[in-house]
Every structure is written in C-alpha cells, then in structure tokens.
Amino acid sequence: MFRGLIYFINMSLSPNWKALQASTPGGGAKGQPGDAKRNRAKAWRAKKSENKKVVGQLDPGLSKAKNVAKSKVIKCQALQIPLRARVHKNDPTRPTLGAILQSDDAGLEEALHAPPQPIEPVLARWKCAPGKFIALDCEFVGVGPNGARSILARVSIVNYYGHVLMDEYVKPIERVTDWRTWVSGVTPAMVANGISFSEAQERVKRLLNGRTLIGHALINDLAVLGLDHPRADIRDTQKPQYFKTVCGCKTPSLKHVMKECVDLNIQQGEHSSVIDAQAAMLLFRCYKKEF
C-alpha cells in the first residue's frame, strides 16, 4: 500500500519538477557520464600546452631554481599583472629613495627614471607632516648566548613622501653580546648617547596611533618594540603574492623585492633603517593594488 502511495506521489510531482528544472540555470539534465572525464582531460592538455610555452622561454644556462622563478614570472605576466615602476637596469646614475618619494603618485614613475639631483629639493611643509601612512624599520643588536636574541638599537620612521619623522639610536636594555655591525651598522659609540627604550617605545606608539603602518617583515620590528598594531592597518611588503612570485620564494627579503620590482639596489653593505623604511614605502606606493 505504501509503495503504491509513494509511486503515485512521484508520478504526480514529476511534471512540476521537470518544469522547475527547465526554468533554473544549470538545472537541466546532467551531462553524459563521460563529460567530467573529458573536461578534466581538456584542462590538463591546456595546462600542458601553457607549460611548454613557458619552458620555451627559459634559459638553459640558468640553474634549475632560477628557471623555476623565471617560469613563475612568465606565468604571472601572462595573467597581465603589471610590473609598475620598472626602470632601466644597471644604471649607475639613479636618484636616491628620498628624492623619488618626494614626487606625487602621478609623477612617481617619472621620478624613478629621472637623473639624480645635486641637491634634493626642499619638501613643501604639508609633505613633512606625518599624514595617514608611515613606514617603520628598526636595527637590532644581539644579546644573550651567541647574541641569538635581538633587542632594539635604532628605530626610523618616514612618512608617505619619505620625510624622516623619527630616527633615533636606542640605549640597549641588556648587555650586548653581538653588535652585528656588519649588517646593522650600529656601534657602541652610536648608542652611547641614544634615547632610552621607554622613550623610543612611547614616541613610536604616538606616531602609530590611527595610521596605516608600512614595513618589511613588521612582525620582527613590532616584537622588538613591544608594540602591536591592528592587522587591518598594516601593509607588510613581504606579504603580497606578486612579490613572492616575482622573487621565487615565500619570504623574500626587502633587498630582493626592491631589485626585482623597482630595479633599485639597497643594502649593499651595512643597513640603514631610514633607507629600508623609505624602500618599503616606495614599494607600497608603486604596488598599492597588491596589498
């Protein structure tokens, strides 16, 4: 009896169900059993063809790792991701980061191509204000066994136009066991007359308040400063997928990103936290859509 009732209900509803299927996009009859398999095969052949095109553009003289990175760039360019602010390679007469950043957004690419000025022009007063965006970079020295742990030795902050808002050496709060001068550029004499850690922390905190923070691998700088910042207000130049693809690694260095994306060389010797902060700001301004 129940089987007959179920059969009767199915028979009475089937015309309505078919009408609903016909009126709904994609609601018609399912494809043939072999359709999914054929579609997968078609997609595989298309991908294989694309890979062959990429391989044809690789240089057999390069190492496997470099060719892998190059293939990623080729595929990225095939997706029409623009390489903004590209400039001529190996040009010894290049403007400084400070001079480039003084330009407005519309003239930024032109500034990258411009010859260096003997004297950098004086910034307008409104370009010297903190503004909405600031870039931060710190230099560390090592403490503890083998200098493995980092503490703050220098902190620099620049605004949207590269103007230095803060650049201070900081007295170490612990005994330094490794000055890391070869990379940090910091010596005992430099920090002897530096400000206290608490003063540096408070000044940075005031500048961060209500602003968007730019920097490279900022988790390290904020940790050493003992500060945090809302994630929504952070633009870390190590994070964009485009930079990772162009550099061919998951955690590209600031030096690597600068060379690959704006063709500028930084950190040729000892680091400068001012230059590194300006470099991060330049990357942000050239590639805003990637953040």
From Swiss-Prot:
It comes from the Eukaryota. The keyword Cell membrane does not apply. GO terms for biological process: RNA processing; rRNA processing. Residues 133-284 form the Exonuclease domain. SUPFAM superfamilies: Ribonuclease H-like. It is found in: Nucleus. Keywords: Exonuclease, Hydrolase, Nuclease, Nucleus, rRNA processing. Transmembrane segments: none annotated. GO terms for cellular component: nucleus. Gene3D superfamilies: Ribonuclease H-like superfamily/Ribonuclease H (3.30.420.10). The keyword Ribonucleoprotein does not apply. Its EC number is 3.1.-.-. It is an enzyme of class 3 (hydrolase). GO terms for molecular function: 3'-5' exonuclease activity; exonuclease activity; nucleic acid binding. Exoribonuclease involved in ribosome biosynthesis. Involved in the processing of ITS1, the internal transcribed spacer localized between the 18S and 5.8S rRNAs. Belongs to the REXO4 family. This is RNA exonuclease 4. It comes from Yarrowia lipolytica (strain CLIB 122 / E 150). The gene is REX4.
